[in-house]
Every structure is written in C-alpha cells, then in structure tokens.
Amino acid sequence: MRYPSGIGSGVGERVVESGEVVAAGVDALADAGGMAMGATEPPRGKPPPAMRAIPTASSTTPADTVSERGMRLFSDADRMPSERASTAVRRTRAAAKLRERGFGALLVSPGADLFYLAGYQVFASERLTCLVLDPDAKATIVCPELEAPRVAVAAPDIARRTWGETEDPYVAVASLVRTAGSIAVADQMWAAFVLKLQAALPDRSFTVASEITRELRMRKDAVEVEALRLVSESADRAYRGILERPFAGRTEREIGADLGELLRAEGHDEVGFTIVASGANGASPHHETSDRRVAEGDTVVLDFGGAMRGYRSDITRTVHVSPTAGHEEQKVHDVVRRAQEAGYAAARKGATAESIDAAARRVIDEAGYGEFFIHRTGHGIGLDGHEHPYLVRGNRETLEPGMAFSIEPGIYLPGRFGVRIEDIAVIDADGSVRPLNRADHAFATVA
C-alpha cells in the first residue's frame, strides 16, 4: 500500500559510441536478454528466534538451491519478458505526444519514467543523468562519464552524451534542445537540476512531463501486464509462506523480516515495505512496524510488497492469532471482503475510477462502518507502487484495457483493530477485470 520506486534493459547489436546518434526504428529492434537493475536492501529487524522446521515455500518454478531454512531460492525474474523492444515503441509514442502538444523536447531524470522510456535504472545523485527526447523520437542520454558503461549495457540503442567531472552537464543538455521553445521535464526531477536547466535555457517554457508520460504509463502493454502478474504471484507465495511461521510472542519487526526474506526467496529482487500491524496498531493504515509483541487473540494486518525487475507488487491480508476469531473481528472481515467483491464487480472498461470506490464504500457504509473507512479504495501500480489511476471520489477517468490498480477497502477501529484486504487487478483487452493476486482471502488463523 505504501511505496518508495525499476528494471533496466536496452536493444541493439552493438555498443553505441559516446556522442553517436542512433535513430533506432521499431522494425530494427531485436529481442535480446539481459537487464541492468538496482535493488535496495530489505528493512533490517532483529533476527527471528530459533523456530520449528519451516515447510518449503510452495512454487511452480523449479529450483536447484534451497536455503538453510528450507526455502526455495529461485527467481521469477529469470523468466520475466524482455523489455527492450517495448522501450523503443514507448519513445515513439512519447514523441507523438510531444508533437501533438507542441513541446520541443522531453527531459527525463532517474526514476520510473527513465526506465519506462529507456530501460535504464540509476539512482538519482548530484551528478545529472537526463534522457533527452525530441518530437522525431531521437533520444540521447546525457550521463556522467563514469556511468557510460552502464548506460551502454542498459540502453545500447540510445545515443550518449557523456560529461566529465569538470564539465557542465547543463550545457550539454542545452545543446541538444536549442530549437525547443517549450520543454516537458520529469515530474520528480530535483528542483536544483530544473533551476540550472532553466538558467541554461532562458526564454524557454517548462512544464511537467506527466502531460506526456502519465497517459502512456497508465495503459500497460502486454509485457508490463505479464510482469505484474509474475510479481503478484511471487507476493502470493510469500503470503502463503508467512502463514506457516509463528506469530504469537514474536515482534512485528521479526515477522516483517520474515516477510522480506520470503519475498526475496520467492523471486523479488527488492523488498519495498513490510507492514505488520497487530492489535490496536492495525487501526493505523500505514503503521510503522514496531517491536510490539504479537499476542494471542490479536488481529494482524499484513501489507507488503516490492519489485521484480522494477515492476511492483502490493498485497494485503488480515489474519487472526488464535484458533478462532472473535465475533466482531469476523464480522468486520466479512464486510471488507464483500466491499472488495463489490469493487471488482464495478470494475470494467468504461467504468469511472470513482465508481469502484463508490461500490466498495457503499457496502461498508450500509454495514455501519462508513466513518472507519478512511482512505481511497485503490491506486494504480506499475513501475511505481502508487501511480494513476486513483480509485477515489471525484476521479472520473474511465478505466481502459491495460490499466492496473489495487482494490483495497479497509475498516479501522481506533484502539481496537483494523482489517484490510488488497489485490492488484488489471483491465483486460475484452474489457473485463482480472485479479493478479490469487492468495486466499479467508480470515486465516495463525499460531
């Protein structure tokens, strides 16, 4: 449910020399393997205490390696589809939008937009890295000289303009957009970079790049939908695995560390977040996992996710620590489950984003818990954990094939407990909605 934002790949038969301009047509692109990736370490908590034998995590993917804790060590990332041809097609579409809207250039800094258009992932730093795209789909990556080898591997079909430590990268960018009167800039580009670009390009107008990239990224292509399916299946397996772990007597942080370990063992190359909210902590949707010890009788909200080759997972289930749940806990869980089902029933091609929120909210309102549903029903997901479309009142955007989003109603009773259920879903080509998460929605009991 909550996110910080990867994959990296490129296309080409040879490495492009620094400064060489390449006009890579879509027809010339060939499939190729290999991706440049970045990953962050999972949250580090206290190591879990010695535990009983842990069943092997279930999987449909063969594995040759098993960890000392009995978990399969494999990666669905090994069978993720190639992104290389897709990035060139996306640049062509972005260039068409530049022409339609009268922009002379698109400047994209490190982040999801850079990966989406170039297949290159690098973390933002004080050294400027910038993709420059013109209305004819001519692309150049301006990058520090020391990063040029990485760019060559990740995006060999894109020209490079490198700069040394004593050179001014803003002059290099300016030289590529001399004729551009209006420039679209990446939404998340650092303000310090934007100000220096404005100084290097006086008398130009600047606008945010979401006018170009938002519409493209909302509608996932087949490669992206498959990536989201695989990463969601990986998260499902992690959930099934955590149900076999002990809860009572252990801290939220220890259980969160288990979730991170399971996500990696089941194929994730990045752990984004592991919310473990037990007892009264469950009434805070974005609870910071703590050292509170889980007790018998607690209801526990588990909201976790990460990335596999850049594409994000996000799943929430609520469990109960005892053989049987209390009457109200079970009642609230049933209401939330019915609310999610109503959201699914409303989701289809042509439906407005707010109509899914209204459908889920109506169930909770009618059950008498309306004031305790305190957030929107869902958010888009892809290369970012939260992106358009947002399923919230007032958003009249219509759902279209390729749009992927969460459906995650919740009820939060202050000082007592909370319940949330979340899946990722996608609108298919035939206009129907398809869940990408398949893990059981039952109010599971754990030891």
What residue ranges belong to the model's regions?
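Low-complexity, Ser/Pro/Gly/Ala/Val-rich intrinsically disordered tracts
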Residues: 1-48, 69
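Exposed, low-complexity/repetitive linear segments and helix-based recognition motifs
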Residues: 10, 14-17, 24, 28, ...
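N-terminal leader/targeting segments
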Residues: 3, 37-39, 53, 73, ...
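Active-site neighborhoods and metal-handling regions in enzymes and metal-associated proteins
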Residues: 69-447
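Short alpha-helix boundary/capping segments
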Residues: 47-66
